[in-house]
């Protein structure tokens, strides 16, 4: 992660970049890249909102915590994608505070390179979720509302599975960076 001063956390230089490898599954080949927009979502009380997934699939049986997010659709920019994903998965309308950074990681099991674009987003209102059939029936998605400390502990707890480790490796540094940005905004 790039070191920066925090006098103006909204400048581009405050963005971080991480490049991670998948050490859980053997690399055979990578046949596609996926542009992903993800959100660290917080409210006026300082709570964070995440997605809980309970899965039993090719990645194994696991209970996970993950940021809201997903693939960027054709002719969609990153900011529209992140706002759409948060509304669909959490039922929350957000304002984008800033881009936190980009994490490049791999899912060797499905031969995919992920380009995760993370945004810090503030809740403006709550509404209905719009989950897909797979998100309901296969991944059993639900919403987690947690303090920063609770979220860190939950990522650590959920890293008991291979997929949980990959997600925690990708998201914990971003969550810590988001907290730094939030703290610097509050102290300004």
Where are each of the predicted segments found?
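A short coil-to-beta-strand element that immediately follows conserved catalytic motifs
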Residues: 93-101
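Nudix hydrolase/Nudix homology domain
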Residues: 128, 134-188
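Beta-strand scaffold of nucleotide-dependent catalytic cores
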Residues: 50-52, 131-134
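Conserved Nudix-box catalytic region and its N-terminal flanking loop in Nudix hydrolases
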Residues: 47-88
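Short, charged/polar surface micro-motifs in flexible loops or helix N-caps
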Residues: 42-47, 56-57, 73, 120-128
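Active-site-adjacent beta-strand/loop module that shapes the phosphate/pyrophosphate-binding cleft
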Residues: 105-130, 144
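Acidic, metal-coordinating catalytic segment for phosphate/diphosphate chemistry
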Residues: 2-40, 44
């Amino acid at each position: 992660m790039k070191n920066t001063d925090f006098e103006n956390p909204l400048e581009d230089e405050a963005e971080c970049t991480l490049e991670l490898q998948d050490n859980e599954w053997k690399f055979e080949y990578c046949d596609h890249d996926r542009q992903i927009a993800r959100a660290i979502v917080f409210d006026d009380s300082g709570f964070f909102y995440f997605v809980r997934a309970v899965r039993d699939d090719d990645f194994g049986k696991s209970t996970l915590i993950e940021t809201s997010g997903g693939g960027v659709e054709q002719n969609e920019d990153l900011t529209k994608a992140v706002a759409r994903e948060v509304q669909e998965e959490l039922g929350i309308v957000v304002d984008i505070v800033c881009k936190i950074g980009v994490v490049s990681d791999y899912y060797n099991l499905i031969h995919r390179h992920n380009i995760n674009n993370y945004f810090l987003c503030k809740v403006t209102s709550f509404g209905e979720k719009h989950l897909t059939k797979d998100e309901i029936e296969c991944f059993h998605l639900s919403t987690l509302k947690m303090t920063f400390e609770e979220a860190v502990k939950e990522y650590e707890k959920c890293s008991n599975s291979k997929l949980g480790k990959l997600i925690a490796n990708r998201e914990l540094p971003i969550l810590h960076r988001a907290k730094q940005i939030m703290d610097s905004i509050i102290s300004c």
